[in-house]
């Protein structure tokens, strides 16, 4: 049998119970927060970038009963607060203008918008024609408030993540905190002792 962690690995509240949780390598986590902070949320391209960044984030557990915790790397264990904030950011990034969605469904893209035009009459009064945005005033107002909600949720959740203190682990403190040992000797410690033919008496 190859190397593995000892029986303490499986105790209640131990490493085995955390294998389904989200683990993120510290450098990748800090890089993600830095990139999210620099994104222009008001632009659709920026919101699309958020989706890509979150999809690319590796949250897999870095160890198993047969794989020792990585050496020379620090990992953050994402708790419910962090996962919730990431979920809010993911949902906020999915915001799209209703007019854009309708155009996309109709197979229409890049419709040139007519600019606002102002006409002066002979009497000196002015009339303004609203630009063609493909949406009604009601839809524009709905979009504005929904976008404002999405933008606020994104920035609040990002600030929360930046200020959050997450549990961090590296190999030595991981194995010390959980009281586990890795190796062939640890794996064989639970094996039954070899059969004995009886007590051994010293020679007279």
UniProtKB/Swiss-Prot annotation:
Q: Name one GO molecular function term.
A: structural molecule activity
What are the record keywords, sorted? Capsid protein, Helical capsid protein, Virion
Query: What InterPro entries does this protein's entry cite?
Result: TMV-like_coat (IPR001337), TMV-like_coat_sf (IPR036417)
Q: Where in the cell is it found?
A: Virion
Return the Low complexity bias intervals.
117-132
Question: What Gene Ontology cellular-component terms does the record carry?
Answer: helical viral capsid
Highest rank taxon of the organism? Viruses
The biased composition feature labelled Pro residues covers 191-204
Q: Which Gene3D superfamilies match?
A: Tobacco mosaic virus-like, coat protein
Q: Which residues form a coiled coil?
A: none
Per the record, the major location class is virion
Instruction: For the region Disordered, give the residue spans.
Output: 112-132, 185-204
Report the function annotation for this chain: Capsid protein self-assembles to form rod-shaped virions about 22 nm in diameter with a central canal enclosing the viral genomic RNA.
Which family does the entry's similarity section mention? Belongs to the virgaviridae capsid protein family.
Query: How would you summarize the oligomeric state and partners of this protein?
Result: Interacts with the 40 kDa protein; this interaction may play a role in vector transmission of the virus.
**Would you tell me the protein name for this molecule?**
Capsid protein
| Organism from which the protein derives | Tobacco rattle virus (isolate PpK20) (TRV)
The organism's lineage is: Viruses, Riboviria, Orthornavirae, Kitrinoviricota, Alsuviricetes
């Amino acid at each position: 049998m190859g190397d593995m962690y000892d029986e303490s690995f499986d105790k209640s509240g131990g490493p085995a119970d955390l294998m389904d949780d989200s683990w993120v390598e510290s450098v990748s986590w800090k890089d993600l927060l830095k990139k999210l902070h620099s994104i222009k949320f008001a632009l659709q391209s920026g919101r699309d970038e958020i989706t890509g960044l979150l999809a690319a984030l590796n949250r897999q557990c870095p160890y198993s009963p047969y794989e020792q915790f990585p050496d020379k790397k620090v990992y953050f264990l994402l708790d419910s607060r962090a996962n919730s904030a990431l979920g809010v950011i993911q949902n906020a990034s999915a915001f799209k203008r209703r007019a854009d969605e309708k155009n996309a469904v109709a197979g229409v893209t890049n419709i040139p918008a007519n600019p606002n035009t102002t006409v002066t009459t002979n009497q000196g009064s002015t009339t303004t024609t609203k630009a063609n945005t493909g949406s009604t005033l009601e839809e524009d107002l709905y979009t504005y408030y929904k976008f404002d909600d999405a933008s606020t949720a994104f920035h609040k959740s990002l600030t929360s993540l930046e200020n959050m203190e997450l549990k961090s682990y590296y190999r030595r403190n991981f194995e010390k905190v959980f009281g586990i040992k890795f190796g062939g000797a640890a794996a064989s410690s639970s094996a039954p002792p070899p059969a004995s033919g009886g007590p051994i008496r010293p020679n007279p």
